[in-house]
Design a protein with these regions (language model features):
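Flexible glycine/acidic-rich beta-alpha junction loops that bind and position SAM and/or redox cofactors
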Residues: 10-19, 105-108, 227-228, 286-291, ...
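A short helix->loop->beta-strand "cap" motif at the edges of active sites that frequently abuts
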Residues: 88-94, 246-248, 273, 313, ...
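Radical SAM [4Fe-4S] cluster-binding motif and immediate context
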Residues: 153-316, 323-336, 364
Length: 623
């Protein structure tokens, strides 16, 4: 049996760190690989041939040699996951839907897939495989019991193209003991944390070490949900690295009560945990109590962050605005806290009510849910929550202002200085060989620091801890993270200005002049709708290299207007012009997240469109 497992492309967000991946990190395409698919592959029968394709780092095959296709997805991937399921099903493939959103809302997939797998896969996926082999697969496999993680196999890391990611991922535990109102983790995994054995984790590290991987993210939603189990794990990791004379670099998500356990902090430091991500949400104690985040109220949050810094462990933070207790003044409180804390990777999101969560059910009762296409992604400029003490537009405007304030060059530099004041002897010392480190710093300087002019250079130089060289790698990482987030805000949070339209109009006119002959002959159709450019190519005669080079240059200029988007439909093309299209797409790849491409079904095997860079529209194919 031939199984193709696909991880759909994520919509870009702060978590993508796109600027860093594209311009600074060496030969990387994404941050984390799809661990769930690697685990699913390990649960398949030994006789099955399994392939994993992650659309975030490679293009999807349009006509794969597969007997069935599984497409996973989180909520933010639902739109693309739906497109892929529909496309492959229309081509005659048996398709299976899975992932966290299918686990939370399997009913959303009833018309999209032949089979839906909902819940943890360790028991239900082997059952599906056996029944599929016998030709009697059901439409829904739902885990309703408790999965013992001792039954979870070593993921098939060998099926992942790990060299394309900045980290590898492992999972020690599932579940969280806390009761945050907005969180879907306890809905899916429960409040009683379960964990793998130390032997299982050592087996996974053996597999990664054999592949040359030593940078690892524990994807547990709360690694210290059971502190005693976490301490046992950490002692095991320390001994494992000593025994094998190797040094891993670890990071994970934890709750803020880590700061109250000196033994746990020391163990994390000794085990080489260089960073932790903490859901801080709000500095306001009343807001934390209202949303049931009581673990954050037991000690001053700023003091807790600094206590973690004292052990050389960096803190990444999650924050939320739009709680019921929030007013417009709350945004100033968030700003002051984030600046004082020194947290560079401060992921601020709009309060979003995920289906099946206590928050969703409460707001539904109160009639305070909005319809929103972005209700599954709280970093977009939309939410499904009706705010209580401000207007919806006021919420969005204040959110944008907050991020713009946080991501000025001055604010980035100030947070670094605040952090380094408390972060002693950082665990993080760089994660690449020395030649690659020099290359990263070089690219940061020329593509990030110097590109920002003398002012940014001045801020950068004033953050370098010249007398504490051990802190320099962390300073470099913070500048990379800060500039990546700044780039995202500049591209996605920018108000559309009437002044943009003349720029579009001038460049559009220049494009029409260049391709005028083809327009008049009907071989090219061209239209604009505000900042959306629609172009259709129906080239029934040889266009030639010069045409495609001029087209690439003019479209590149048009797309340099930040809000401009392009939908390119290729209806007809001679084989001798394929090289021209390849050059066109290569030139436009840097704008790929704003370019949608539609191919005539007869051209899908002739024209190579990298769906990991462009949005390849599958349900809108030209006839």
């Amino acid at each position: 049996m031939r199984l193709l497992l696909i991880n759909p492309k994520y919509p870009e967000s702060f978590w993508s760190f796109k600027w860093a991946v594209d311009h600074v990190l060496p030969n990387k395409r994404a941050i984390n690989p799809p661990l769930g698919l690697a685990t699913l592959a390990a649960l398949c029968p030994p006789s099955w041939q399994v392939e994993i394709v992650d659309e975030n780092v490679e293009s999807i095959p349009l006509d794969p040699a597969a007997d069935l296709i599984g497409v996973c997805g989180m909520g933010v991937q639902f739109q693309r996951q739906s497109e892929l399921l529909c496309y492959y099903r229309s081509k005659g493939y048996y398709v299976v839907a899975g992932g966290s959103f299918a686990s939370l809302c399997p009913e959303r997939y009833a018309l999209l897939a032949d089979t839906v797998v909902a819940g943890e896969a360790e028991y239900i996926w082997p059952r599906f495989c056996a029944e599929f082999d016998r030709g009697c697969a059901a439409g829904l496999y739902r885990e309703t019991g408790v999965v013992a993680l001792s039954d979870s196999p070593i993921p098939r890391f060998d099926l992942l193209k790990l060299d394309r990611y900045s980290t590898a991922t492992v999972q020690f535990s599932r579940g969280c003991p806390f009761r945050c109102e907005f969180c879907d983790i306890i809905v899916m995994f429960g409040r009683k944390p379960r964990n793998k054995s130390l032997g299982q984790i050592e087996g996974e590290l053996d597999a990664l070490r054999s592949l040359g991987i030593t940078n690892v993210f524990f994807v547990d939603d709360n690694l210290i949900g059971r502190p005693s189990a976490a301490k046992e794990l950490l002692r095991g990791l320390i001994e494992y690295q000593r025994r094998h004379r190797c040094a891993f670099r670890f990071g994970s998500e934890v709750s803020i009560n880590l700061a109250q356990d000196a033994e746990l902090l020391q163990l994390m430091r000794d085990a080489n945990f260089g960073w932790v991500f903490i859901g801080i949400e709000s500095p306001d104690p009343q807001t934390l109590k209202d949303t049931r985040k009581v673990q954050n109220t037991r000690q001053d949050v700023l003091s807790s962050v600094r206590a973690i810094y004292a052990y050389g462990i960096d803190v990444l933070g999650g924050f939320i605005v739009g709680f019921d207790n929030d007013t417009l003044e709350s945004f100033d409180g968030q700003y002051r806290f984030i600046m004082k804390s020194g947290i560079q990777a401060a992921m601020v999101g709009l309060l979003t009510a995920l289906p099946k969560t206590p928050l969703y059910e409460r707001l539904q009762r109160e009639g305070r849910l909005r319809e929103s296409d972005h209700a599954l992604d709280n970093t977009k400029l939309a939410t499904n929550v009706v705010p209580k003490h401000m207007g919806y537009d006021q919420l969005l405007a204040a959110y944008q202002r907050l991020y713009r304030r946080l991501l000025t060059d001055r604010a980035i530099a100030e947070r670094i200085r605040h952090k380094l004041r408390y972060l002693r002897r950082p665990v993080y010392a760089g994660e690449y060989p020395l030649p690659q480190r020099f290359a990263i710093v070089w690219r940061l300087l020329f593509k990030g620091i110097l590109a920002g002019g003398p002012s940014r250079l001045g801020h950068f130089l004033r953050t370098i801890p010249w007398t504490s060289p051990r802190k320099i790698p962390l300073t470099v990482v913070d500048w990379i993270a800060g500039l990546a987030m700044q780039d995202y805000v500049h591209r996605h949070f920018r108000h559309k200005s009437p002044r943009d339209q003349p720029g579009i109009d001038r460049k559009f006119a220049a494009l029409r002049n260049v391709i005028g002959e083809h327009l008049r002959a009907g071989r090219v159709a061209l239209a604009t709708h505000a900042v959306q450019i629609d172009m259709a190519l129906s080239l029934d005669r040889l266009a030639g290299r010069r045409f495609f080079d001029q087209l690439a240059r003019r479209l590149d200029h048009l797309l340099s207007v930040r809000d401009a988007t392009l939908k390119l439909t290729i209806e007809r093309l001679l084989s001798r012009d394929v090289a021209g299209v390849d050059r066109l797409l290569t030139r436009l790849a840097r704008h790929g997240d704003r370019i949608s491409i539609v191919l005539n079904t007869q051209l899908v095997h002739l024209v190579r469109v990298d769906s990991s860079r462009f949005r390849l529209l599958l349900t809108d194919a030209a006839a």
